[in-house]
Each structure stands twice: as C-alpha cells, then as structure tokens.
C-alpha cells in the first residue's frame, strides 16, 4: 500500500460585525505509519515544503536532487546525525521527533506517543507511574490537548507545540524504577 499524505487548506468566508471575514481551515496531513521517513514527510508537508525546497536547503544538487530526500522518506536511506540536525533546522522541528527511535530512554517513548496520537487522535494513555519526567510530560501534553479540544488553540498551534516539545530530561536512560 502506498503511504499517501494529504492536506488541505480551505477558506471559509463568513460575516462578522458586518464585514466579510475569511478564515483559514487547516486539515492535517494523514500519518499512515510511524516510521522515521513517514514522520519526516509528514512534517515537510505540514510546513508546505516540497522535496525540491528541502534538497536546495540541504545543498543537494544535480538532476536527481530529490532522490536523497525521497530515499529518506521511504526509509531506504538513513541520515547521519549531522544531516538529521540540518533537516530538523530546515523543518523547524525538534530533531528528537524525527530521529530513529531505539527506545533505550524514556524520551524515545514519550516522543513516540506524540506521534501515535497523530494516527489515533482520540487515544488516552495513562502509564500510572511515579516517574517525574513522565508525569511532567503527561501534565503538559494533557494541558495542550485540553486547550485544543476547547478550541483555545487550533490544530496547527497544537502540532507546532508537539514538534518543538523537548522532554525535560532527554538523556535519561530507560530503567524499570516503577
């Protein structure tokens, strides 16, 4: 099955105080799996960037300059750590959100959960732990989810928060304290 990502921007005109107001309605891209390549593609589309845009910013030239990025997005090629950092700067995203997860530290699991919600938006997770890092993450995440649900923030603002979120103790090694 082809992994298709799609997004739409719709404009909705309405009257407000006697004036015609145009509201932008954003429908998010669809995430079909949680592979590193699909996550990179999701953010690229969210940012309204083409493979050409990113290839240019990475300094890739030649007739087939998009090939490298296509291979990243399909998972056929792994980036070096420095290339991943360059890519995250271009995409304006925390590099931990688009890295390959090894699940050797708490932060990998927490970042994975942020992506899991993109596939299953109504998911609710309670790990029932006493770990301070995990509890802080869930407090902050649930606060932002509530703001989105109450329409205090829109999806774009919520997703911006997610892709730039930094787990407070990123370097913690995963252990079985609980």
What are these model-predicted stretches?
Residues 11-34, 38, 42, 78, ...:
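Charged, helix-prone or intrinsically disordered regulatory segments positioned adjacent to compact structured domains
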Residues 41-44, 51:
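Short, cationic motifs built from Arg/Lys/His that form the positively charged side of catalytic pockets
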Residues 46, 57, 90:
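Residues within the alpha-helical elements of helix-turn-helix
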Residues 53-58, 87:
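Short alpha-helical "recognition helix" segments of helix-turn-helix
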Residues 59-79, 100-104:
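Recognition helix of helix-turn-helix/homeodomain-like DNA-binding domains
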Residues 140-178:
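Charged, low-complexity intrinsically disordered regulatory/assembly segments
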């Amino acid at each position: 099955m082809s992994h298709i990502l799609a997004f739409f921007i719709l404009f909705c005109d309405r009257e407000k105080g006697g004036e015609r107001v145009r509201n932008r309605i954003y429908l998010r891209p669809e995430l079909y799996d949680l592979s590193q390549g699909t996550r990179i593609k999701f953010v690229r589309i969210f940012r309204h960037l083409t493979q050409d845009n990113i290839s240019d910013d990475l300094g890739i030239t030649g007739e087939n300059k998009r090939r490298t990025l296509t291979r990243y997005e399909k998972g056929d090629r792994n980036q070096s750590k420095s290339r991943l950092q360059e890519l995250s700067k271009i995409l304006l995203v925390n590099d931990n959100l688009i890295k390959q997860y090894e699940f050797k530290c708490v932060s990998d699991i927490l970042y994975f959960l942020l992506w899991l919600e993109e596939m299953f938006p109504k998911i609710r997770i309670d790990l029932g732990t006493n770990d301070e890092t995990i509890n802080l993450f869930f407090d902050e995440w649930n606060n932002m989810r509530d703001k989105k649900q109450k329409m205090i923030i829109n999806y774009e603002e919520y997703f911006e928060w997610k892709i730039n979120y930094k787990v407070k103790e990123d370097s913690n090694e995963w252990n079985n304290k609980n």
